[in-house]
């Protein structure tokens, strides 16, 4: 049985994307695992066997891209064009790692 990534936890330390209805992920209260929202049985059923496999939310965060506990989902989404600066915890442009001035995520 695959080990569930603890970063997918939907408890106190849940990633913002786990609770964002637009992210394609949701939380299973019974098991506190993040799962794809198209698997409704994961969200409303027993949660048994629910594993987070295709959900981007549950992939490990790239180092240097973390914006703290309350990071916006787009800051950790590799497809958003944004990333986070670990030094200042500000959202920044992923192409040049400078502080984000034009990224929609940071508005």
From Swiss-Prot:
Belongs to the metallothionein superfamily. Type 7 family. It comes from Tetrahymena pyriformis. Pfam families: Metallothio_Cad. Residues 1-2 form a propeptide. Disulfide bonds: none annotated. Keywords: Cadmium, Metal-binding, Metal-thiolate cluster. Induction: By cadmium. This is Metallothionein-1. It comes from the Eukaryota. The metallothioneins are involved in the cellular sequestration of toxic metal ions. Binds 12 cadmium ions per molecule. One of its GO terms (molecular function) is cadmium ion binding.
């Amino acid at each position: 049985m695959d080990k569930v990534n603890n970063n997918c936890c939907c408890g106190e330390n849940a990633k913002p994307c786990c609770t964002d209805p637009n992210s394609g992920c949701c939380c299973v209260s019974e098991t506190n695992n993040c799962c794809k929202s198209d698997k409704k049985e994961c969200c409303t059923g027993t949660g048994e066997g629910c594993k987070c496999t295709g959900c981007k939310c549950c992939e490990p965060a790239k180092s240097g891209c973390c914006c703290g506990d309350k990071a916006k989902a787009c800051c950790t989404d590799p497809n958003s064009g944004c990333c986070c600066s670990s030094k200042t915890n500000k959202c920044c442009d992923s192409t040049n790692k400078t502080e984000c001035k034009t990224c929609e995520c940071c508005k």
